[in-house]
Amino acid sequence: MYLTFDDGPSELTGKILDVLKEQNVASTFFMQGSNLQNTGFQENVKRTVKEGHYIGAHSMTHNSEKLYKKGQFVPEMKETLDLIHNITGTTPKLVRPPYGSAPGLKGEEIRDQIVEAAIKVWDWTIDSNDWKLKDNPTQIIENVKKQTTEEVEVVLMHEKAQTLQALPEIIKFYKEQGYEFGVYNDEDHFRLNFQKDQRL
């Protein structure tokens, strides 16, 4: 099972990494270019990779108008992947579309562009809804538990204070259920997009 964190890096990245290290869990992060450009966050970006986590791209702007209506999805993802490479030395190919691939990647043309750019896309199987549950870690934990039904789950979370509070309990739950934690690997990509496009 895969824990994933969107919208970093942030002032909470280091604290999330501390919890993951303490629990001996590797995770997958989808980071935003505008935040990656903040030099104050870059040490923790390097630390993320150093401690065995994967960093994929979550666009430069997180702006659905630009990404999906003005044709900037692939250019923004490439720019973000380049930033990740420049900071960490890794060469990731995985991206997560802001707001998910449905409806953003509905059009065949945008998906063709993604394939041409040799980019892979990941959505999620469990939405924790953490971003809108300020001061309510208990509900985040419940959301994750009640959606867990499959052998392989990909949990969508964000770098938020309430998520940090919920994280130890979420990890404990999965360990008790006998799940093994995985970290994304470009070599072992499996399809996980709401458009069910085998190419992505």
Model-identified regions with their sequence ranges:
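Catalytic domains of cell-wall/extracellular-matrix polysaccharide-remodeling enzymes
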Residues: H62-E187, F194-Q198
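Active-site beta->alpha N-cap acidic-glycine motif
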Residues: M1-Y68, Q72-N86, F173, H189
